[in-house]
């Protein structure tokens, strides 16, 4: 890449440079504080997903980058495919090139899916469908209910497919035209508390997808899934019942989806009363999952949703402050 273009590696380190630059261009102190500091970091050692990705966006902005491509620590430029004899093997892909090709077609944002073990590990119990409906993940119901056959492994079937318009954006497989930041919303995912324990909502990339669905930006699926080592020990099959790490991952995925759902129900103009049936399904599915895993944490998912709903006013405040600060930064930076 360096032989063909100017390449910069954006690393998340200290924010001293960003603080100085924002101060120089006239961003208010309150906005700088909102963009660079999060109370969860010092108090609990947690960084909200959206906050982290915005740090990378700002560093790329201040570096003068034209295109930013996210490379998460748990992905590799490979895809899983089946051989003619049915075995699964990894195949190297031109991940960076695929994103740059999509951006060269005029896209503001390029994205695609993942290859590897899904966040839903292999399982088989009554209540799987209820749980996913309660978590607004019903599109995954057939996949999960058949997971004992495919072991939760996502394999790429199509080759050389052409990029297609999409509204689905995944932060770990993402390219951005930096000039689009004038119309692109910031990444955002709120946090909330349950029994004094902080929980991070997922869906930090959902606002970008919503902007694409409203035609504010052009987003392409580059048809290039990237290998995601979900549990950090591929090719070991995830064992939900006997591996506490797998249960932890699923538990925090559930609490993350709950936080996302509560916030985006509000963002899309819905009220909690519209989801009474889903709440019943969440309670039934959570009870079934707790029995299946012998892990009582899952029993509390309905209580955790109630806690998230009580935190909605605070989530809205987090969002409005983040959006206001981000808009001020981009207006100052691109209006120089």
Question: Where is each model-derived feature located?
Answer:
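Conserved catalytic core of nucleotide-sugar-dependent glycosyltransferases
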Residues: 78-189
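Active-site donor/metal-binding and catalytic loop motifs
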Residues: 202, 218-241
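Terminal low-complexity segments of carbohydrate-biosynthetic enzymes
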Residues: 230, 239-336
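Short beta-strand-to-loop acidic/aromatic patch adjacent to the donor-nucleotide binding site
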Residues: 65-82
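Acidic donor-binding loop at a coil-to-helix junction in glycosyltransferase catalytic cores
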Residues: 198-207
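Extended charged low-complexity segments that act as oligomerization/scaffolding linkers
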Residues: 5-23, 99, 121-125, 138-157, ...
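Active-site-proximal specificity loops/subdomain of glycosyltransferases
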Residues: 2-63
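Short, high-confidence coil segments that cap the C-terminus of an alpha-helix
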Residues: 65, 104-108, 217
């Amino acid at each position: 890449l360096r032989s063909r273009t100017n390449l910069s590696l954006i690393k998340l380190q200290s924010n001293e440079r960003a603080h100085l630059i924002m101060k120089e261009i006239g961003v208010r102190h309150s906005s700088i504080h909102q963009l660079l500091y999060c109370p969860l970091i010092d108090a609990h050692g947690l960084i909200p997903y959206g906050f982290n990705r915005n740090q990378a966006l700002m560093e790329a902005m201040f570096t003068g980058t034209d295109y930013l491509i996210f490379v998460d620590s748990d992905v590799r430029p490979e895809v899983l495919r089946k051989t003619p004899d049915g075995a699964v093997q990894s195949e190297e892909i031109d991940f960076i090139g695929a994103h740059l090709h999509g951006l060269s077609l005029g896209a503001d944002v390029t994205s695609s899916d993942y290859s590897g073990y899904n966040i839903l590990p292999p399982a088989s119990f009554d209540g799987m469908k209820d749980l996913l409906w309660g978590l607004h993940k019903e599109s995954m119901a057939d996949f999960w209910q058949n997971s004992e056959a495919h072991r939760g492994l996502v394999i790429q079937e199509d080759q050389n497919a052409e990029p297609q318009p999409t509204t689905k954006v995944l932060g770990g497989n993402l390219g951005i035209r930096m000039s689009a930041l004038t119309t692109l919303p910031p990444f955002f995912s709120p946090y909330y508390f349950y029994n004094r324990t902080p929980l991070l909502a997922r869906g930090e990339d959902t606002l970008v997808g919503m902007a694409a669905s409203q035609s504010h930006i052009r987003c392409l699926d580059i048809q290039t899934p990237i290998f995601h080592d979900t549990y950090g020990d591929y090719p070991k099959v995830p064992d939900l019942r006997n591996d506490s790490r797998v249960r932890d991952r699923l538990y925090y995925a559930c609490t993350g989806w709950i936080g996302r759902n509560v916030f985006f129900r509000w963002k899309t103009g819905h009220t909690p009363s519209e989801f009474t049936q889903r709440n019943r399904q969440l309670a039934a599915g959570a009870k079934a999952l707790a029995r299946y895993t012998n892990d009582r944490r899952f029993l509390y998912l309905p209580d955790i949703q109630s806690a998230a709903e009580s935190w909605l006013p605070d989530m809205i405040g987090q969002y409005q402050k983040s959006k206001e600060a981000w808009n001020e930064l981009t207006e100052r930076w691109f209006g120089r």
